[in-house]
Amino acid sequence: MKNIALIFISLLIITGCSSESDLEKYKEHVITLSSDEFEGRAPGTPGGVKTKNYIADHFGSLGLESFGDSYLMPVNLTGVTLDVDQSIFDLSVNGEIIDIVYRTDVVYGTTRQVESVNFTDSDLVFVGYGVNAPEYGWNDYKVDVKGKTVVMLINDPGFELRGTDFKGKAMTYYGRWTYKFEEAARQGAAGVLIIHETAPASYPWGVVENGWSGEQLNLTFAEKNLDRSALEGWITLDVAEKLFAEMGTTYEEMKAKALSKDFQAIPMEGMKLSSSMVNTLKVSDSHNVAGYVKGSETPDEYVLIMAHWDHMGVDPTRDGDQIYNGAVDNATGTAA
């Protein structure tokens, strides 16, 4: 690119595949990064270090310039690991705690970077898609949910409506779980439970189960993320169907109600959540890897091309193969 600077952020390796030779190089990078040698590429592990060095070495071979004396840019991370055996997730219906199994029926934790989080008797409220999108004239939060636990659908209404609302089947940011947790926190919710459904999520429950159990890494925040909801989690479609049946309705009926701009959040009468979470915190340092090609005409302008290099590492509790190799997520993006 002649007129602007092109920047490659680590999250990545970029070579392009404009020829058969480039395609072979791309495939080689994918195979290498997703091999057992890289141990699942988890930050703060030997496999993560090997991954960063691999990317930096390749940037050097391409002749990319660096920001400073290294392609490595430090990032401080905090890992939060839920002690499941010491933690409590009590979902009750009319005073009776229902049987819910961690990982099989629910995954949960906290984004707050603290050793313990507790709340009791938080009323459940179904908030449709959990979306507040003024540009689409859409607001699922027309009631006060402060201190309550909001239950919501994955994706955004466009996935089902397929019309002009949102972007049809293509997910907007409003459909992502990251947004849903952020918006629930802005609304003051104590807890957030996303209902998993494979088609609108675009991945099966196993992805949620594996991704949300074990250590959860985030940037280290001075305020310890205390502005986030106390509990963030997912429940299976089967659990949601049972809860809605207790309300005398069905999942499909509730979803149909949520597909209207006039939707009003629905209290899930008699249903409450109490939780006590015990966490182990681990602070570690990792790096982004960044290099750039300076433009000849406007060298102070940049085009960013990014991909995350990390994956889920190794799970020693698993039987058999314990390495999450992460070819699709995200060796393919890193090698692109």
Please report, for each region that a protein language model flagged, where it lies by residue.
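Noncatalytic luminal/extracellular "stalk/propeptide" segments of secretory-pathway proteins
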Residues: E39-G163, P267-E269, S286
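Sec-dependent signal peptide recognition
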Residues: K2-I9
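Glycine-rich, acidic and aromatic/proline-enriched surface loops and short helix-turn segments
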Residues: L23-S35, G147-D156, K294-S296, M306-V314
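Soluble metallo-hydrolase cores and metallopeptidase-like ectodomains found primarily
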Residues: S92-N94, V106-K142, E223-A327
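Extracellular/luminal Protease-associated
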Residues: Y102-E223, Q322-G326, N330, T334
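C-terminal motif of bacterial Sec signal peptides marking the signal peptidase cleavage site
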Residues: T15-G16
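Soluble non-cytosolic domains of exported or imported proteins
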Residues: E20-K27, A42-N53, M171-T178, A230, ...
